[in-house]
Amino acid sequence: MRIQIPNIEVYEVNESIQNKINTAEEDITNIKFENVVETVQGYKLEFKSCKFVGCICTASKFEHMYFTDIIFENCDFSNTDFSESYFNRVEFINCKFVGTNFMVSVFNNVKIKNSNFRYSNFSMSKIKEFILEENDLANSYFQECEMKNTYISKSDFINTQFFRTKLNKIDFSDSNIEGIVVAMEDVKGMIVSEFQALELSKLLGINIKT
């Protein structure tokens, strides 16, 4: 599946995200944040055409934020609050976002690759043009989400909750969905392997005669 990729022009390298937020009079644009280690507090700001490389900003707050044309690479934003935020043309590569809150957010043209998003919460988010490749999303939450045009490959969804999220036309066949939480109406049109279909039937209380 093809999605729009981030369009980034970086002109400045900055060593503090918080200082940039504190002094911002308008959108934060064309910045590369590299090897930043700090706890950040941000609210209702927009980052455009920026790169975050090797940053460690755990237990931070980025509520109601806008991220457009952004790359996160080799970053750790675990236990950070990104709730009610907007992500458009964003890539997460080799990142750690364990226990991160993305509730009630919007994701358009977003790619997450080779990253750890265990225990992250995407519930009540609107998700489309979304690629997940080789990620660990075990014990994460996608409850009551709208998911459209989503491509998933070789990812781990052990005990992940998709309750009240329609999984129509989403292919999980080469991913691990052991113990996922779904309702009968959620799995209509979901694409799975033969073995996964048998496991899902057990979760849903369906007995198959052999």
Where are these regions (language model features)?
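Tandem repeat scaffolds
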Residues: 2-210
